[in-house]
Each structure stands twice: as C-alpha cells, then as structure tokens.
Amino acid sequence: MELIKRNIHMDRVKRSTVIQFTMEEDLNLPEDKPDISTLNLEKGEVVIEEIRPGTDEVTVRGKLGYAILYHTQETGSNLVLLSGALPFEEKIHMEGTLPSDTVAVNGTVEDFTVNMINSRKLNLQALLLLTARIEEIYDEELPVGIQGGSAGEGVEYRISPMEVTELSICKNDIFRKKEEIPLPSSYPNIYQILWSNVSLRDVEFKPQEEKLAVQGDIQVFVLYEAEGEERSIRSYETTIPLNGTLECQGCREELLPDIRYSLVRQEHGQPELTIQPDLDGEERILGLECALELNIRLYEEEQIDILRDIYGVTKEVIPDTRDASLRQLLARITGKTKVTDHRKTDIGSPVLQVLHSEGIVTIDHQETTEEGIRLQGSIDLTVLCITENDETPYVSTREQIPYEYTLNVQGVKGTDQAEVHSELEQLQVNLLEGEELDVKAVLSFSTTVMKNIPLEAIEGVEEQAIDSNVLAGLPSAVIYIAAPGDDLWSIGRKYHMPVKTVRELNALESDELRPGQKVLLVKGLA
C-alpha cells in the first residue's frame, strides 16, 4: 500500500526582532556653504545597503540620509539646503539565524534632531529603528489518498477537506516611474531646488494575466529659488497619477496579492528630482524618477482533500505520523479612520500662512483583541509656515498627533501572522485664529492575516497481520453507548469494523453521535 501525496508550497515568518540604536555626529559646514542664521527644516531617512545573515545574528549596513534647510544672513539666497549621509553598521542578535536564511530589514527614523553649535557647526542626533524578519519558504508533502497492493481492501481511511492558501509567486522587483512635471505658466523659472518631498497615496496592486497592475498617486512638493535678481522663494505642490504594469510570469487574475512596497531613496534619503529645460530651454520642468521596491507574494486558495487517519479491519494498519503546519488565509482587510486635532504653534513669530505639511504614520503598539487588531500610534507631522519675520520668514514646527484604531478581523488570534501596513491617505492643515493649527487626516491600514493550522500528517503506513487474540477478544455482538467525543470512526477503529457497516446496521444518516446514543455492533459483518 502506498500513499498518494500532494506538495503544498507556503511561506511563513520564522522569527522577527526589533532593535533601536542612536547616532550622533558633529557636522562642519562645507566651505561653499554660507553661515547658519537659524535652522528651518530637517528630515532623516534610513537607506539599507547590505544585509548579511550569520550564525545567530544579522549584520546590517546602511546610511542615515539627512536634509537640513537653514536661513542665512549672507548675500545671496535666504535659504540654503545641506544634505548628506552618515554610514552605520549594526549587528542584530537573532538566535537560530543561519547564513543561508533570507532576512528582510526595514529601517525607520524614530527621532531626528539638529542643534546649532555655532554658525558653522551642527550637532545631529538620531534614534533609528531596525525591524528584521526571517522569511521562510517551505513545503509540506501531505497524503491525499492510497493506492497499490491491497488499498481499500480491509482498510478504512478518512479524507477531510481543508482550505489551504498556497504561495504561487514569491519574488522581489522594482517598479519604475519617470515623469516630467512642467511648472504652471504663472510660476517663475527654477534656479535651484531647496526642499522637496515625494510621497505615495492610495497604492494598489491588481493581478492580471502575466502582469501586475500598479495604480495610485504621487504627491510632489518643491520649495525652490527662482531665477532673477531677487532670487525669490516659491513653492509648488501637485499630485500625479502612479499607474502602469509590471511583468510577472505566472500571474493570474484570481491570485490574492500581498505586496509590501517602499519608495527607493537616494543616498541623501530622497527620490531623484531634477531640474530640466523645456522646449524653449528654460528651467521649468521637474524630472522625477520614482522607483518602488516591491516584495511580491501572490497566493491561491484551494480546497484539498487530505488523508487524516487510517486503520485496518482484517489487518493492522499502523500510520507513521509527523507534525505539519498549513497556512490558511483568514482575512484581507483594509480600514480607514479620521483623525482631527488642534495644536497651538510654538513658532515665536506671527504666522501668515501654512505653506506645506507632511506626515508619517507610525504604529507604536499592536494588540490582538476579540474585536480584531488594535493599533495605537501617532502621525509625525511637519508643518512649514510663512511668518511676518522678514529676516527668517520660513519656519517649521513638528507635532505628534496620537490615534487609536481597531481593524475589524473576526476570529484573529495572537498566534496568527498579521503585518499591518499604515498609510497617510489624506492630510490637511489649516491656520486658525490665535496661531492654532487645525489638523485633519485620514489614515489607512491594511493587512493580510494568515492562520497557522497545525496537524498530524501521515508520512507512511505499516501493514501487519492482525493479532488473533485481539479479534478473539472482541464480543460477537454488543450495544455500545456513545461517550462524549465518540463518532462512528472511533468506534469502527476500536472494534475493527467498517464505518459504512456500522452506519447501515444502525440505520444512521451521519457518522456523528450524541452522548448516550446506543450503537449495535455485530462481529464479522463487513
């Protein structure tokens, strides 16, 4: 007798860990940069360059890209951009890690502070967070039937249907988007870009035949110095569509996507945004090269009939079992919540207008409850304002806006795998009377919840002649009174009788029994 087996291809997170570390650096201004009068804006971004798994540890090498905008009193531009990167190398202890493991590392800046030591020297302090995950592709070979020899003769076996989520496609790729953004005619030509921010909104992925459709929005903000004697400071903000397709061999419309994405940053922590001439040779076009780093997982749900148990009627059939684990999609959920807040500005000068606002959604705490996945965190908000101060008209303020939200996922447990992706879908900051900021935001959260299903898998079976003493010890006829948990299968196994025979003998319509129910068993019936 041989088992018919089916291979099931799946993935799981083997282990994960989070570390924090600090970076501090005193930075001297390059000779070609004018003296600092006051600091205005700063931001930091983690750029991961290399991930090296080892024994019980992972080495991560990367850079902290920074951009600092400051005021100067020297002749020329009123605002100056200073950008660069600080290298780092960190070891993350992860017990059980092997050099052959596949490790994914995400880096975020928890806090980035710039202090002015003097007009030519700055102190940079940053708190960085690294999240490492060992992702494992694994296969389970499970029995789905029996064949050969005396299969089916004197043998009872139980087949149970199970919903399984198989991994169909697993790969990393990059989706690139090039766009030329012309300035409106009312805007002056660009001399140099002082500050920029590129962010993604409403990004979606849809499987198609042999390709993956990408759609969403790209929000672009630039603060620039205009051409001309006055060198005026202007800002421009726009939203452009993100759409296109990515070749994906084996992709089909019915597959379920779980795709993690991030915007590829340059060394200084920003996407590439350049000044380009228009057809008249004037510097009026912003050239954007946007790249999305994609971690692609495409799944397929399938119902598979699995051989769960087997016993012999005329012989001993002994199953050899092992522990196995299957993956099952519990839910693909997207939820949105509105966040509103009022914040008093602490700028020091009367504010004339809010020029630009940007934010990052952080998840500080994630907890599984009866209602679903409870999330707590904040919007790390940066607001650029124009003030009445003619010497330093541009001032920024940073705020943390708290939120709490529960993703409604029925039946989720703490042992289930659920990585939540957060996104700032909408952000609006208005200036109220009394130097107060009115903040309105829409946050979007999405997750794919995978349930782990442990089971005993039959690896093989051993056939032996049945002990004659066992058969002799069975009664010729007996009225069996069902105990809690009994069914026709457990009774048939105990008395070496076919389930169908017991069912027909007792005129039963199902194999389920209620406690105390009487079942007639007659030895020798087949």
Which ranges hold each PLM region?
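Membrane-lipid interaction segments
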Residues: 1-474
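Short alpha-helical "recognition helix" segments of helix-turn-helix
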Residues: 491
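Extracellular LysM carbohydrate-binding repeats and other cell-envelope/extracellular binding modules
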Residues: 497-526
